Every structure is written in structure tokens, then in C-alpha cells.
């Protein structure tokens, strides 16, 4: 996702390593991020302390889905299902990291190359494969030798 507007933050629900990776991906794409979680990993705490993202230390609520147009659910499957029930009937589009088939969109593995934003996506079905392909293409574009 490449954000063209920074005045409308994207909600990330989940404060663990997946939430951190998705937050970094959104920040790299120019998005403004608001985090909601009962706890945050050290890397997210650092982003919060630096004022790079805003955060609320609590569980997700229906009002969050009414307030945000886009949300990333970086949660285990059961918590994702519970969050989707809260979201029902709102206009919020969601990316479901643990259950991609239930989401409305998926984030691309992305990077900057000159004036371009380049992204690779499996549509949420194989994030590890997308990350690996990103590394290969990025190395090629940057003229690095590839290991075989």
C-alpha cells in the first residue's frame, strides 16, 4: 500500500512482531499509523516513544472500525475472528494477517528504488515467498550479486 494521504491514519491492531512488520511496511509506504493492543513489543515501543506512531494500550473496539477506513489485524486467528465481528457493518476495510482469505486487502513487500515504490504481493497467501522475491528483485535492481 502506498499512502497518498497522511491525514488519515491506518489502524494496526496487534502489538507483536507481525504488528511491527506491518507497521514498518505502512510507514515505508508513507502512511500514518495508529496502533491498538494490550501490549507492544520493544520495537513498537521505540516507534511510539519517538512519536513515529500513535498508540492506545487496550483492546480493539467497534468504534475503532467506525473511525478508521483501513485496518490491519496482526492477530492470531481467534482474535482476528473476534475483531471481524466488531467490524461487521462498518465501512472499514481490513487486512487479516493470520486469515488472509477473510480480509479485503493485503500489504505488499515493498521498497523504494529511486523515484519509484516497488512492491511484491501474493495477495496474502504467501508473505514469506513475497519477501524472498522482494529480496531477489531488489538485489537485481541494485546490481548486487545473487547467491545461488
Give a label for each model feature.
Residues 21, 29-47:
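NAD(P)-binding Rossmann-fold cofactor-contacting core
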Residues 1-24, 37, 129, 148:
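Glycine-rich adenosine-cofactor-binding loop
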Residues 37, 55-59, 98:
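Short loop/edge segments at beta-strand edges and connector loops
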Residues 70-75, 81-106:
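ADP-ribose/adenylate-binding Rossmann-like module
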Residues 16-18, 78, 124:
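Residue-level detector of alpha-helix initiation sites
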Residues 109-148:
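Adenosine-phosphate binding glycine-rich loop
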Amino acid at each position: 500500500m502506498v499512502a497518498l494521504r497522511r491525514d488519515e491514519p491506518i489502524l494496526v491492531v496487534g502489538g507483536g512482531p507481525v504488528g511491527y512488520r506491518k507497521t514498518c511496511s505502512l510507514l515505508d509506504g508513507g502512511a500514518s499509523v495508529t496502533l491498538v493492543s494490550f501490549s507492544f513489543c520493544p520495537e513498537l515501543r521505540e516507534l511510539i516513544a519517538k512519536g513515529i506512531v500513535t498508540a492506545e494500550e487496550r483492546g480493539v473496539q467497534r468504534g475503532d472500525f467506525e473511525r478508521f477506513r483501513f485496518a490491519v489485524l496482526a492477530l492470531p486467528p481467534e482474535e482476528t475472528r473476534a475483531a471481524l465481528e466488531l467490524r461487521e457493518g462498518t465501512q472499514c476495510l481490513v487486512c487479516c494477517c493470520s486469515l488472509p482469505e477473510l480480509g479485503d486487502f493485503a500489504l505488499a513487500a515493498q521498497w523504494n528504488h529511486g523515484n519509484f515504490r516497488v512492491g511484491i504481493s501474493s495477495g496474502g497467501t504467501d508473505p514469506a515467498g513475497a519477501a524472498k522475491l522482494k529480496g531477489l528483485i531488489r538485489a537485481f535492481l541494485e546490481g548486487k550479486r545473487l547467491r545461488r
